[in-house]
């Protein structure tokens, strides 16, 4: 599974097929909802198995299954299952409505958008995981959207943007740890360089949300705040911020929702089971997409698709700026092919370090570029865990969210400008 692979352009065919079917067909039809993403992945997965050099058909299928059953993929599936169960049980006991009422009563109308973005930034920065932040805040964001009339995909995109901010900067984020270790620099030094690039973007996005929020007016709710029903979300946030494993966090949230529901009389024991079952079923499509993507991307790796990208990106580098651009492109393509920014960093980090050493790129700058571009791509691809999770919890499509992802897009632009204009100067000369 992990042997050296020869660069092979044709190994990228499944990815090209997927993009062609899903994006081009949708653009031709003028409707992104007409092409189910599951069908696009099914076709591209069949192509991946058909063109693979893995030997007999049963061996190629076995290779595909091993990719789908990768430990990272299985962990994502477990999180999706628990997240679906928690979201539905919290909704059934009234925890979502109670939390939304609390947020609407505390935050002025004009601060709803900016407040949600800042909350997502702070939570993800504290807990070091974008997925955990999305799990915790998306149901609340959807509830606020429903009660205020705000566009639901827009509200969910705010949460995703804030979640990617923390994923990029947090000291305890997997991406920060891998980026600094592979480049050989301290976390605090990487944080300084990274902050100079992305914090101005976060401030700009917050200002944009403040202006957009100034037009929002809500009708004061006559419903009193049910503090007891807010407890499941408070527990989830506190345990997440304390660094508890996200699966334990979700299990505690599910149990707490049941206890609160029984105490308040809003749900019976068997209704709790039914709510969990419904929530898990709602994640079915998301899980199918994740498994198909995992298998397809493993076939691409096995047949040399990623090796081909790495070879092409590192062949013609001749300057420090070119080296930084190749590092950015390298990790971006790796993430595009793996849909996992941590894995993308592990794959591209050693190569990026070699490029940085040969052309005199500051390790702090290369670590920042690796982390930032991996989070940029991860935050916008429709088959990444973040958008899939957010879309699943909000019952919308990833494409519906993508058009409103202000922060991830601007983060990518800012990182590209930092390369082109040699910023920050101290770490670019």
Regions found by a protein language model. Give the residues of each.
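Membrane-interfacial loop-to-helix junctions in multi-pass transporters
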Residues: 70-76, 101-118, 145-155, 199, ...
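Hydrophobic alpha-helical transmembrane segments of multi-pass integral membrane proteins
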Residues: 77-86, 107-140, 313-351, 370
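Juxtamembrane and boundary regions of transmembrane helices in multi-pass small-molecule transporters
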Residues: 32, 161-164, 168-223, 228, ...
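Hydrophobic mid-bilayer segments of alpha-helices in multi-pass membrane transport proteins
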Residues: 9-21, 33-53, 76-82, 228-239, ...
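Core transmembrane alpha-helical segments of multi-pass membrane transporters/permeases
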Residues: 38, 42, 50, 61-94, ...
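Interfacial loop-to-helix junctions that mark the boundaries of transmembrane helices
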Residues: 4-7, 27-40, 67-71, 103-108, ...
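Alpha-helical transmembrane segments of multi-pass membrane proteins
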Residues: 110-123, 149-166, 322-335, 359-380, ...
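Re-entrant/interfacial helical elements at transmembrane boundaries that shape
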Residues: 132-143, 160, 171-185, 341-355, ...
């Amino acid at each position: 599974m992990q042997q050296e692979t020869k660069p092979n352009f044709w190994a990228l065919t499944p990815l090209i097929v997927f993009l062609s079917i899903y994006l081009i067909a949708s653009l031709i039809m003028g409707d992104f909802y007409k092409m189910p993403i599951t069908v696009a992945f099914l076709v591209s997965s069949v192509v991946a198995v058909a063109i693979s050099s893995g030997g007999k058909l049963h061996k190629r299928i076995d290779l595909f299954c091993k990719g789908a059953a990768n430990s990272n993929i299985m962990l994502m599936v477990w999180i999706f299952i628990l997240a679906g169960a928690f979201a539905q049980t919290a909704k059934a006991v009234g925890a979502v409505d109670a939390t939304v009422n609390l947020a609407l009563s505390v935050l002025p109308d004009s601060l709803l958008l900016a407040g949600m973005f800042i909350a997502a930034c702070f939570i993800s920065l504290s807990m070091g995981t974008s997925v955990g932040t999305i799990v915790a805040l998306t149901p609340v964001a959807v509830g606020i959207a429903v009660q205020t009339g705000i566009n639901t995909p827009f509200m969910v995109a705010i949460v995703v943007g804030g979640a990617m901010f923390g994923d990029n900067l947090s000291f305890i984020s997997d991406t920060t740890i891998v980026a600094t270790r592979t480049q050989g620099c301290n976390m605090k030094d990487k944080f300084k360089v990274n902050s100079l690039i992305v914090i101005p973007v976060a401030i700009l996005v917050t200002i944009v949300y403040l202006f957009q929020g100034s037009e929002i007016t809500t009708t004061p709710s006559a419903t009193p705040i049910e503090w007891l029903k807010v407890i499941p979300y408070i527990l989830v946030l506190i345990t997440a911020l304390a660094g508890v494993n996200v699966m334990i966090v979700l299990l505690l949230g599910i149990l707490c929702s049941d206890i609160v529901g029984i105490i308040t009389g809003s749900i019976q024991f068997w209704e709790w089971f039914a709510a969990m079952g419904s929530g898990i079923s709602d994640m079915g499509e998301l899980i199918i997409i994740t498994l198909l993507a995992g298998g397809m991307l493993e076939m691409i790796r096995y047949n040399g698709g990623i090796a081909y990208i790495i070879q092409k990106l590192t062949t013609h580098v001749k300057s420090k700026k070119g080296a930084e651009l190749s590092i950015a492109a390298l990790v971006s393509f790796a993430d595009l092919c793996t849909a996992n920014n941590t894995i993308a960093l592990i794959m591209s980090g050693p190569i990026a370090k070699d490029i940085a050493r040969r052309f005199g790129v500051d390790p702090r700058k290369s670590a920042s570029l690796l982390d930032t571009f991996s989070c940029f791509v991860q935050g916008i691809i429709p088959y990444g865990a973040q958008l899939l999770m957010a879309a699943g919890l909000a019952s919308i499509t990833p494409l519906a969210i993508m058009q409103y992802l202000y922060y991830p897009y601007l983060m990518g632009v800012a990182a590209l400008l930092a390369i082109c204009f040699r910023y920050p100067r101290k770490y670019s000369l």
